[in-house]
C-alpha cells in the first residue's frame, strides 16, 4: 500500500523488492486515507486508520466439484481431462500457477491484456471473474479487497464425509463498492466478462450463484452448467477500530468526533 510500503524507483507504482506487487492507495483498505479514485473520504477522527472486515465461513462440496469437473471435461473435450478442466474453471493450475502468461519477472505478475476473448484464461474462470485486472473501467483497483483464507476440516481423500471448507477474511473501506461489488457485479453477473465486448463468459463456477459459462478446451467450446459447490454457513460484517481508538476506550476516555 502507498504510504506503508516503499516504491521501486526503477518501476514507479510497484513495491520495492516485491516483483509484481502493485502499490494501491491505502484508502482502499484503511479508513480516512486517499483511495484509488483520488478521493480522501471524510471520516470521524476516531475511525481514521481503522478498517471494515468481512468474515465468512464457507462450506465446500469437494466431491461434488470433482464430479462436475470430470463431467465437464468429458462433455467438452475428453482428451482435456479433469485436471485441465479444473484449471480452466479456476484460472490456475493445481500448484497455484496462473494460466495467464506473466508480464513481469514473477509468475503472479500477469494480466489479461493479450487474452481479450479468454482463450487462455476463460472469462468465466474464478480468478478472472473476481479480479479482471487489465479490463473494466474504472480500474479494477477501485474494487479491490485484502483477503486471506483459513482452511478447516481434514483433506478430502482422508475423510470424504467430513465437513470442510474455508474461513474467508477480508478488509476494505466500502462493502458496497468492494466486497459486495465483486460478488454482485462480477462473480454473479453472467454478462460480465472481464474481457473484450462479446467475449464468452458466465457466472463464477467456484463462488457464484447457480448458472453456467462458456469454456474452450481442446479446440472445442462447451456451454457448462454450474451449481453451487461453496455455500456460506456463517458471516460477519465488522468494524476494526484503529489502535488509537482502542487505547482511548481502554483508558475510559471519550472518542474524538
Feature map (PLM): residue ranges:
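Long, histidine/aromatic-enriched segments associated with O2/redox biology
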Residues: 1-257
